């Protein structure tokens, strides 16, 4: 049995990785992992991902210090996505929020919505200008 790295982005075979707070169940972020990133995550207990924009592996929190300690890894029925149950140290979102899902979409028309249709539902944990 094998993990199914069937999604290809920029020539890299990846799986979808969802980071979830291990205590509350809050979804923190969605990213991609290639085989090496998943292996490194398993070996170190720290979340590693594959950056599709930089085409490189990265350790979550490498520059910000906001790391993810992996407590458990769940695999979906198709073996092409994982949920990382993590202890989030600091914030998961590079924009300064605990979760990347800090906005609520309040519209019935996804083809024509604007900034007023997005409601910020979380407070910032840090100022990105101070970290990046």
Swiss-Prot record:
Q: What is this protein called?
A: Phosphoribosyl-AMP cyclohydrolase
Cofactor(s) needed, names only, are: Mg(2+); Zn(2+)
- Look up keyword Phosphoprotein and say if it applies: no
The gene it comes from is: hisI
How is the quaternary structure described? Homodimer.
Alphabetized Gene3D superfamilies for the sequence: Phosphoribosyl-AMP cyclohydrolase (3.10.20.810)
One term under GO cellular component? cytoplasm
Q: Which reaction does it catalyse?
A: 1-(5-phospho-beta-D-ribosyl)-5'-AMP + H2O = 1-(5-phospho-beta-D-ribosyl)-5-[(5-phospho-beta-D-ribosylamino)methylideneamino]imidazole-4-carboxamide
| S-S bonds | none
């Amino acid at each position: 049995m094998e993990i199914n790295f069937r999604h290809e982005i920029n020539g890299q075979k990846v799986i979808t990785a969802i980071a979830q707070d291990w205590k509350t169940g809050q979804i923190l972020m969605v990213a991609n992992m290639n085989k090496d990133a998943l292996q490194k995550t398993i070996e170190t207990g720290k979340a590693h991902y594959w950056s599709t924009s930089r085409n490189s592996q990265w350790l979550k929190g490498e520059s910000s210090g906001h790391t993810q300690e992996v407590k458990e890894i769940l695999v979906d029925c198709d073996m092409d996505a994982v949920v990382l149950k993590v202890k989030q140290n600091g914030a998961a979102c590079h924009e300064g929020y605990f979760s990347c899902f800090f906005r609520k979409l309040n519209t019935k028309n996804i083809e024509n919505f604007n900034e007023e249709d997005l409601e910020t539902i979380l407070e910032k944990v840090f100022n990105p200008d101070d970290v990046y």
